């Protein structure tokens, strides 16, 4: 684990700070995980000419105040309603602006602000109920509410969603992050139990998400052909024994090569891996803030 704070070992006096630390840790750990197919990692920029690992790390750190304020707002408000949704929406836009100032206009974590912001708020609403499915379901209830101040979307993701008829990040959140909860996390735990090291277990979790996600980042860059390459290739790695096996490693290298040739990067899956890492750690550290509630 990249340790901004070793949260599992250190009691947390402030719930919002603890949740913000967890969220930023998850983003940095996702960025540093290597070798990820066609994504920024310790090896290089993947399919991104405008990104590098240092920028991803700086971007993640810039979002700490945003996540802290989201957690504080949810804890103060104490219930899911339109007012909370509006507050969280504005905080997310403020966080995005801070991110863009840090990155000089490069979109590094817009999707992660949405996913992790919802999960941070959901965890703060009921901090003693930290099981992944419960937290993700609460986040989904928040996401179901419309934010009246949100601009009409014309992002790459929104255009892809309309063109290809896929749900995108909004639908994934509204459903309670099923690709993270039902695919990523179970694979993470299975790989650990099977003896894989932590980095390989996380890679396998990413691949499990990639195998089932209609990733709008890949669709935007490479269409249905690219999506099939991503999903089929991820399944092939897992079927060959996962990233910890020699056969799986060879398949992973092939998937990386094919996605790079298409200039297709599974950014949506990366955001959901960060969500998995956040949810995975949450129960283990929740005892640290019990005294502050």
From Swiss-Prot:
Q: Which residues form a coiled coil?
A: none
Q: Which residues cross the membrane?
A: none
Its Enzyme Commission number? 2.4.2.52
Per its record, how is this protein called by name? Probable 2-(5''-triphosphoribosyl)-3'-dephosphocoenzyme-A synthase
Q: Which reaction does it catalyse?
A: 3'-dephospho-CoA + ATP = 2'-(5''-triphospho-alpha-D-ribosyl)-3'-dephospho-CoA + adenine
Keyword Transferase tagged: yes
The enzyme class is transferase
Instruction: Name any Gene Ontology BP term.
Output: prosthetic group biosynthetic process
Give the protein family. Belongs to the CitG/MdcB family.
Q: Which domain of life is it from?
A: Bacteria
Going by the UniProt record, its keywords in alphabetical order are: ATP-binding, Nucleotide-binding, Transferase
An example of a GO molecular function for this protein is: ATP binding
Q: Which InterPro entries match?
A: CitG (IPR002736), TriPribosyl-deP-CoA_syn (IPR017555)
Q: What does this protein do?
A: Involved in the formation of 2-(5''-phosphoribosyl)-3'-dephosphocoenzyme-A, the prosthetic group of the acyl-carrier protein of the malonate decarboxylase.
Pfam families per UniProt: CitG
Q: Which organism is it from?
A: Pseudomonas aeruginosa (strain LESB58)
Question: Which HAMAP family does the record match to this protein?
Answer: MdcB (MF_01883)
């Amino acid at each position: 684990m990249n340790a901004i704070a070793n949260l599992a070992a250190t009691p947390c006096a402030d719930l919002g700070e603890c949740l913000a630390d967890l969220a930023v840790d998850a983003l940095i750990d996702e960025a540093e995980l290597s070798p990820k197919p066609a994504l920024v990692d310790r090896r290089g920029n993947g399919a991104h000419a405008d990104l590098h690992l240092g920028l991803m790390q700086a971007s993640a750190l810039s979002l700490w105040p945003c996540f802290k304020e989201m957690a504080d707002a949810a804890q103060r408000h104490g219930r899911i309603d339109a007012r909370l949704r509006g507050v969280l929406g504005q905080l997310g836009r403020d966080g995005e602006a801070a991110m863009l100032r840090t990155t000089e206009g490069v979109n590094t974590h817009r999707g992660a602000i949405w996913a992790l912001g919802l999960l941070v708020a959901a965890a703060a609403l009921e901090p003693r109920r930290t099981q992944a499915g419960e937290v993700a379901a609460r986040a989904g209830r928040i996401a179901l509410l419309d934010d009246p101040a949100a601009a009409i979307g014309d992002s790459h993701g929104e255009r892809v969603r309309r063109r290809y008829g896929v749900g995108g990040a909004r639908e994934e959140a509204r459903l309670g992050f099923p690709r993270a909860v039902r695919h990523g996390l179970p694979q993470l735990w299975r790989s650990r139990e099977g003896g894989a090291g932590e980095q390989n277990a996380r890679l396998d979790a990413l691949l499990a998400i990639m195998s089932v996600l209609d990733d709008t980042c890949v669709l935007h860059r490479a269409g249905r052909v690219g999506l099939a390459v991503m999903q089929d290739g991820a399944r092939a790695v897992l079927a060959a024994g996962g990233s910890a096996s020699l056969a799986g490693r060879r398949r992973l290298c092939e998937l990386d090569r094919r996605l790079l040739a298409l200039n297709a990067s599974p950014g949506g899956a990366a955001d959901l891996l960060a969500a998995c890492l956040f949810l995975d750690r949450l129960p283990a550290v929740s005892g640290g803030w019990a005294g502050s509630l």
